[in-house]
Amino acid sequence: MFVIKRDGRKVDFDKSKITIAIGKAQHSLLKDNEKIANSIAEEIAQEAIMLQEIDIKRIEKMVFDLLVKHKQKDVARAYEGYRAVREYRRITNTSDKDILELIAGSNKETINENSNKDAYIIPTQRDLMAGEISKDIARRKLIPIDIMEAHDKGVLHLHDIDYQLQPMNNCGLPDFKDMLANGTVINKKKIESPKSFQVACTVLSQLFAVVASSQYGGQTANHIEEILAPYLRKSKHKYEKMFQNEDNKEALVDLMVKKELKDGIQTLQYQINTLMTCNGQSPFLTLFMHFMPGSEYEEECAMITEEILRQRIEGMKGPDGVTISPTFPKLVYALDEHNAKPGSKYYYLTKLAAECTAKRMMPDYVSAKIMRQVKDGQVFGPMG
């Protein structure tokens, strides 16, 4: 006896496939009943023996009707949902409608999927169009049916379906400190270790963009002040040499270092918010702020942390000239013994962070003390 498939092919009748399909529908509702599944499969098998050839659509209808007959209406509905996803997967092209709606601006699900993507500009639209094709293939060929069915029903939300096809990582904690200290390669060009704070900020912003173009989730600059502190000292040494014969050498050096610090952090903030990655988005970036007293670059770390907070308090201007709170980079500030208590050495930074939070809803806070307890004595930023 044979089953006539949708494309007209004839294949041998396999009763176990009916049992498995019913079992999956039952399992999705935690109502496993092998006896009923086997009974229905046997009834259909008897029909197939009598007919010798049976159409796949007839089998599906019989499964549904027999489930209802066995007082399994909810399982019958689950089977219909399972069958609908299978039917979707058989279709060779299902993305045309979604792509046309995306171009027209009416595909709200895709448009609103990520806050750092402006879906109304051409580069982003092209990325999203490619994403719709990837999503379509993933839905039909890659993602398990029960997960896809749960997504469609709203039981769960499978985020970034459009990136599931390729072997890309999601969020990460790249070693930016090493890339700046030892140099790196961008677009097949060797990037040497920066010789000044301003250049370090510029190179770092380029690294953020490159990482964002190579993955689909967030990234964190872990201990951002420690990453940049050595280059602030290099700039200081540069100015000390420049003004070595001046009577007011210290005042001039201090003035120039503070100016370069402000300019560098401003460059970083503006580059992050204006650079576009290859998929038309701003880098989804977190700056994690935490340093320890007694470290080699303690003074520079404190200066950098303060400047990051002050510039976030100042905000950025939107297209209409009104000051706004930039979404990125996200800021995370670690509370520790040396900054959390009144009278502690860096309590002034925590007060500044609190002022920033009151005005800009950032930074978020983590407890360094608790993190050490649960993370083997380590303190580090969130992954993205």
Where does each model-flagged region fall?
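Charged, amphipathic alpha-helical regulatory modules used
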Residues: 1-106
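Conserved catalytic cores of very large enzyme subunits
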Residues: 88, 96-384
